[in-house]
Amino acid sequence: MQIALLLLIAYLLGAIPTGLIVGKLFFNKDIRKFGSGNLGATNTFRVLGKKAGIFVTIFDVAKGVLPAIFPIIYDLDIHGIWFGLAAIIGHVYPIYLNFKGGKAVATSAGVILGVNPVVFLIIAVIFFTLLFTTRMVSLTSILTSIGNFITTLFFDDIILQIISFLIMLLIIIRHSSNIKRIISGTEPKIQFKK
């Protein structure tokens, strides 16, 4: 019963639309109507600016970290990745918004941080290296999700490997429109200020 309740809490936590809330509360903007229309951190950066983007990124990562460490908090004999997966599903399919959510990149990163900080550090290096190289958040996110799965293969954790594979597939599917733009050469690139 406790595990079922915590899975539900993890889902509801993951479903909190951080970007939408920040946009409406502080900027009187529905970010779904601007930029890419996505609820995630990348579109928040584009539409609402750096400070809002950083806040949303941190909060979305936290939405993954907290459920992932539920087994530590509540002394449960279950892998934290299951609660993390519930949070990811909540972020992608939020009940509060008719199940139309974000792409789960930041929340997935938070889940990995919660269950295996070493893997997180490795994929963080991969992410920022690719970001500065390609300047495309979408391509970076896709390749990092693949890198995350490959990285988990070097750890003795079959559950983490399986869920990381599913997360990779989910992130690729959620970026299908981005993939089309990458192929056509029309995907936006971010500009780094000197």
Swiss-Prot record:
Q: Which domain of life is it from?
A: Bacteria
GO annotation, biological process: phospholipid biosynthetic process
Alphabetically ordered keywords of this record: Cell membrane, Lipid biosynthesis, Lipid metabolism, Membrane, Phospholipid biosynthesis, Phospholipid metabolism, Transferase, Transmembrane, Transmembrane helix
Its EC top class is: transferase
Its pathway, per UniProt, is: Lipid metabolism; phospholipid metabolism
MF (Gene Ontology): acyl-phosphate glycerol-3-phosphate acyltransferase activity
Q: Which EC number(s) does the record attach to this protein? A: 2.3.1.275
Q: Where in the cell is it found?
A: Cell membrane
- Supply the InterPro entries for this chain: G3P_acylTferase_PlsY
Question: What reaction does this catalyse?
Answer: an acyl phosphate + sn-glycerol 3-phosphate = a 1-acyl-sn-glycero-3-phosphate + phosphate
- According to the record, the segments passing through the membrane are 3-23, 47-67, 78-97, 112-132, 153-173
SMART domains per record:
G3P_acyltransf (SM01207)
Q: Which GO terms describe its cellular component?
A: plasma membrane
- Could you tell me which Pfam families the record lists for this protein? G3P_acyltransf (PF02660)
This protein's membrane topology, according to the annotation, is: Multi-pass membrane protein
Q: Which NCBIfam families match?
A: glycerol-3-phosphate 1-O-acyltransferase PlsY (TIGR00023)
Record-stated family: Belongs to the PlsY family.
Q: How does it assemble?
A: Probably interacts with PlsX.
Tell me the function of this protein.
Answer: Catalyzes the transfer of an acyl group from acyl-phosphate (acyl-PO(4)) to glycerol-3-phosphate (G3P) to form lysophosphatidic acid (LPA). This enzyme utilizes acyl-phosphate as fatty acyl donor, but not acyl-CoA or acyl-ACP.
Q: Report what the protein is called.
A: Glycerol-3-phosphate acyltransferase
Q: Which gene encodes it?
A: plsY
